[in-house]
């Protein structure tokens, strides 16, 4: 009898020890995962928080109130928390790409000749920009509100400015602190200007291009957006052509003329002049040549964007291809294609090897 009781006590003690060991191992495993994937875990937490806030705030506002700002991207407006289901949910592509970038961060902070291969601010900002686009566009199409539209535009400006300033930081050997200062100062000023312009219908110049006025909102949503894309093209043309001026001027001019949709003539002219000036400045002050492998990732990324740009045109309200009641929405395809392009651009940036000094 005594032996049986003793065995039972011993058995219970062993079970308790095993249970404690399992708890300790689980805690240690989570601790290790959090340490190695801190940025990924934090991002998941923030996304869950944003989703919760979206549901709580939306239940008493845009879900029950008339729409405030129609996006005019074909899809019919639905009742409830998500006004444009397909145009909204397709933005999860950007979020997924950002999370993939964060998951792929190294588990240690070892230095590399390529910052995009490090656990550093540069891939984290790239991922943040991708997630920001997804969240911002989700807010615009999901809520049909003015603040949602502002989130959409600021997200796009945040991301598209990153390659430009990142390339400059690599070409001219900026410190991390200088890069962050320039990047965030310009972005904050841009976001404030865009938000103010979106809520105040300010006309800067009447009849600027024919009968079309130049509005304050055009500075960020037309000129600055296009300028960032053009400068990025100039930078990549510079690196891939070995600083040949004809490519540095020709590529952004062709893109500006062929990919612009409904832009005023004066806007096209001014952008082309700015592209020529910037190409000349970078040509005669080249800094380091960035050695990256364009094939296949850069070309696939640009291909996805160009096809997406064409598809985007069919996704506007009033187009012959527009079917508001269909589950297939061209604008949703635009989101998926451009989300894919971000992933391939990320892969392209990871191919950089040691920069070389350029000599004229």
Predicted feature locations:
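Charged/polar low-complexity intrinsically disordered segments
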Residues: 14-16
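Early transmembrane hairpin module of multi-pass membrane proteins
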Residues: 21, 26-263, 267-269, 291-299, ...
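Active/binding-pocket-proximal capping segment
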Residues: 271-279
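A two-mode feature
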Residues: 278-282, 290, 297
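Short Cys/His-rich Zn2+-coordinating modules
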Residues: 286
